[in-house]
Structure formats: C-alpha cells, structure tokens
C-alpha cells in the first residue's frame, strides 16, 4: 500500500491531468512581492515570423479571438480609459472543511480541497483552509504561512501571509497580523534558506530560534514543525510552520505529522504557484493599463512642452506617492547643462505651477544627481541620501540635504526614440507610505515602473520638441516667404514704365498677331511681351469681369517674368509667354472661349503664364535621381507642384493680387483649376490620361456639359499649348528645337558629371545627330494624335495640326538625309578598306 503522501500526490496529479489545462510558466519564475509582482510573458510562437525591415511580431491578434473585456472603456464620468474595474471577482464560496479521521474520508476531503484549488485563486483564503484541514490531522496549536519576498536590492526576506491560525480563528484575524522575518535567521529563515524541514521538540533549546516574536506576541513557543513550500523547480517560495503539538507524544510532532504536513503543503505549493501566476498576470495587465492611460494622457498634448511636463510630473507624483518630481530637459546646444527644469511637489498637484529655471534654482544637489544620471545613462536609486557616500557632493552638501529633507531618491534618464541619447532626466524624491506618509526607500518595482514610464515621457517630450521645432521652422518660413515675395515682385520703376506705356497705347491683338497660331516672339522685346500679355487679359474681358487694377496687373505680369530663370535655355519667360499666346489663340481664334466660363478662362491664362515658374532646366527624373530637396516635398509631378507653389507665392505677394476681386468661392475654384492645369503639363500625367480623352473623341461622346470630361479637355488643351512650338513655321521650329536641345544637353552633362551616369540619347550631346529622328518619334508618340483630337473638338484649331504635320515632314526629310549620309559614309569606308 502506498504511503498516504504518495497516494495523495498520485491522486492529485491524475485529477489535474484530466480537468486542468496547462498554465505556461514564465521563464524567470514567480517571485512574490509585498506590493506587486512582475513576470516576463511567454514569447509567441509567431515571434520569428518576420520579414526584412518589418518589426518582429511578438504576438498575433488571432490569439485574442475569445470573449475578452474591451480594451478601451469609459468610467462613470464618461472619460475614456484603458483601466477596467478589475476588482469584481466571481468565485464560488469555499466549502467548510470536515475533520474525519478515516483515511477514505481524508481522500474525500482531499478531492474537496482540490476542487476548491481549481476554482479559487485567493492565496490567503485557500491556505487558511488548508491549515484548517491540517489541523484535523496533526492538531497543532498555531499555524503560520510565510512567503518569500525580495527588496529592491534583490535581498530575500519573509513576510507572513497567515499568522497564528488557530482552531476557530477567522481569515481576517489570521491575515491582519503581518510580520517580517530576515532571511536565514530564526527557524523560518533557516528553513527558507536551506529548503529542508525542521522538527524541533524544544524551541528555546535550539540556537536558531528567535524569541523576539514570542516577546512581541506574548505567546510561548515549545515545539515547532517547519517545512518549506517549493514550486515545480524546487525553489522555496514559502514556509509553513506549525507550533506546539496539542496532544500525544509529549507535545512534540511525530514522523506521521511530518508526512501529513508535507502532503498538504503540496497543495499550498500548487495554490501559490497558480495564484501567483494569476496575480502576476493581473498585475502585468493592470500595469500595462496604467502605462496605456499615462501614454494617452501624455499624447493628448503635443504643442506645449510646459504643459506636457506638468502632466508628467503630476501623474508620477500621484501614482508613485512621492513628495517631489523634477524633470530636467537637456540643452541641445550645450549638452552639459539643462535648458529647462520643471519641478512639482505633492501639494502642487492639480494647481498651476511654473517651471523652475537655473536662475531661481534652490536645490543644486538635485542637479548633481541629474547630471550624473545623464552622463552615465543609467538609473540611480538611493534608499537614504544621508547615508550614501558614493558621491563627493553628498558630504559637501549635507546641510543642504537636511534642510530640504532629501532622503530617498530615484533618478532615471529619459532617452530619445533610438535610445542612444539622453534628452532629459526624471528625478523623484522621498517616496511616502500611502497610509502614514512616512518616507521610505524606492523599491525594484518603482524602478521598473519609472523605467517604463519614461519611455512614454521621452516620446512625448521628443514629439513636443519636434512640434516646437516645426513651429519655429514655419515662423522662419513665413519670414523667408515675406522676404522672398518682396524680392520676387517686380521693381517699382519697371512697373511704372509698363503701366505708363500701357496707359498710352496697347496695340490690338491683330496688330500684335497674337491670335495667329504661327505667332513668333523672336522680334519682340521683354517689355513688348508684357504689353501683349495685357492685351490678352483685356481682350478676354478678364480685367473688366474681375475688377483688376491696372497697376496690379502690370506688376503681376512683370513679377511672373522675373521669377523665370534667365540662365535656362528654353523653359524661361519666353516659353511661358508663347504657351499663353497659344492658349489665347485657341480661346479666341479657335473659338473655345465660348465653351468655357469666365473663371476657367482666367485660370487657364494664369496657368499658361505660370506653368513653368522657377524651372531649373532639368526634368522630374533628374530631380528625383539627384535627391534634390524638391523631391522630398512631392511624390509625383515634382516640378509641376513647385511651379504651382511659385504661382501661389506670386499671386499672394503684396501688390500682385490680381484675384482680389473674386469672392471666396470663386477664388477657391480658380486656384483649383490653375493647379489642375499646371499639373497637366507633366507629360507623365498626359500619357496616363490621354487614352480616356482619345476614346471619347473616337466614339464621338465628348461633351462640354460633363464636368469630368470638361476637366479632362482643359488638361489636354494645356498640353497642346505647352507643346505648341512643334506646330510653328519651320524656321521658328528649328530655332526652338535648338534651344530645347541646348537645355537637354546641359542636363545630360550634369547627369554625367554629378550622377556618374550615361544620359539618354535625348540628353546626350554626343548623339545630337539623332535629333531629327527623335523629333519624328516625339511627334508620332506625343503630338499628332493630341492635335487631331483637339481639331475634332474645334475645327478652328486645325492650324495646329497642319503645322505639326508639316514639321514632321521636315524632320523626317532630315532624318532620311542623315541616314543616307551615314550609309554612304559606311559604304565609302568599306571600299577604302
């Protein structure tokens, strides 16, 4: 027959294997603490399922597919919080123990106890019941349960969870008395340290016995049966003690008592293990909820560093029960000092408080500790500053320390997001007992919590600093734009000259020939091009319809001209003017104005004149490859977006506001059309959208009444005007082609020199003999079908298509001639060879 203890163990194991799911045990084990516990959560099996550049997935959302409490809840006042009401516990009541001596009844009692263990996680209540069960077997006078704890220095000690449990005693009576025992001192400390049971007949004859407890309680201890409670790794997690055998064997505990005690203590081990796992998970959950609430509180404020520092200090003081919290912000320009210091005391929580500055500093020793932590980048926990001799300034400032009543101190660095730089220091002074207000040392749990909290503090502070930096940058930008707009505006003398000339006489559109699609600007001066532009605005009725002041219009035209770079061969003011002239001709001679609103006409002319503002002589591809700052501003159509921004800058500059006569809605509509029109000059967007337009024309389904189709037409019209040089008479087309080639070759030279890359044939100076064939390819791929579609919409735009076809014939002839010359050259070379 198996011994009672072995039978019990086998029976319990069998019962648990059938009814209880395995509980994963954390790697670092379970340690009971007087205030809280912490434990590393087991790693998810998905942790290694990562992809390059992606964060490691510690856990999958699918693992939470079960009925769980909501993550975000609302309290009674309706405030959103991560903290739930976890105090409500639904548990079955504990059954009362029965004290029968029969072994079969003992097994029944064990099963009854096992059921309680499986459905309850209250360590104190269950262990109290276990002791009452034990009392029925070994009949001792008193029982006590001590749990192993650790302080902030990881020094172990024992604290009573149940003390002096006696027959008839209540749970409240046994759990109210709390006694702390030193490790490896006294009988209990010895058993905890060595993990071996002790059966002592006369306590006062044992040198290990500590009579202080008897002196405190007034109780006389005689015999002691003291046994360790171990977890599954054979680590001592507690000690159970039975005192003074009440009957039989001379008042001493027998070997059978030892076996019975050990058997039932196995249940205590199970209870402690399960309950501590549960308690740890609850504490971890609550701590995470607290951190989430704190993070939410911090990130509510991102605009003012003063406000966020006040929130941080008030939250830490309230939660951690400290007398004073000081937050030091490191000076970026002078890393050895602090730029801002915010200090709050317990009495100031909830009140307005001003940050301390170094000029008003009254406690230099705080700076010394903060400077030390900043330099070492490690936390500092001093239980009693008056007894700490590690730092030379402690003794030098002892009077100062006593004056300000500095005792316990916890100082932690606040690091940036990359954890490689200290951006601040959080310093706590004098932790208080929650009930008495007595000053005590910070423990390991305080260190861990503050370490976690300053991570959120660091993010909050860094984000706020970034916001302040952005605000300063925006302020600087506004000043820069103000200066830029001043210098971007035309000179007053030039404006007055144009205004006077325009007031005297502006030739008619027929005289200036600006309604002709074959128009050439080569014989005009810059001032004459400005006069032509005034005539365009006048003949389109824009000056009259939108109450434009003559002086403002003159200044705006000259300012637009000024903001085109003179060192760019082709994409300069003359190209913008020619684009606007083609737009004017299409609107007037092409009779397209009749199909548009006044706002659309206004927007198209402004867009045509502004569509290449501040062009740098390079295309979008070069901007992207060279990693120009402009490439960081826009994800596509980089230069076109920049042209629109420059257009806005000129339009909003003082003295250039030609749209001031528009209502707010008209102004918004006009800017929207201008933006769409300027972006439409990006050939990449044209190629992307032209298929839809050509299909509408092919099916004869295009209608100006459809807003989307009309918007698409305006985009195509902008491209047609932008490329109109390809439709000019052959002499003009040749000269413009030379300008375009010069600009492209300059970009190719820069690509070869700056980017160390071989340019495309279009940009390659060494391939200039291919210009005719490339022009033919450009006309076929980009231009012909566009002008055919435009002519289908308005037959009066036929000159554009005719000019394009004629120039194609000219370029094809040159290409054929060059190919023939090349073949003849190769043939002659072959004959000579």
From Swiss-Prot:
It is an enzyme of class 3 (hydrolase). Pathway: Purine metabolism; 3',5'-cyclic GMP degradation; GMP from 3',5'-cyclic GMP: step 1/1. 3',5'-cyclic GMP binds at residue 775. Its EC number is 3.1.4.35. Belongs to the cyclic nucleotide phosphodiesterase family. PANTHER family: CYCLIC NUCLEOTIDE PHOSPHODIESTERASE. This is cGMP-specific 3',5'-cyclic phosphodiesterase. It comes from Rattus norvegicus (Rat). The lineage of its organism: Eukaryota, Metazoa, Chordata, Craniata, Vertebrata. The gene is Pde5a.
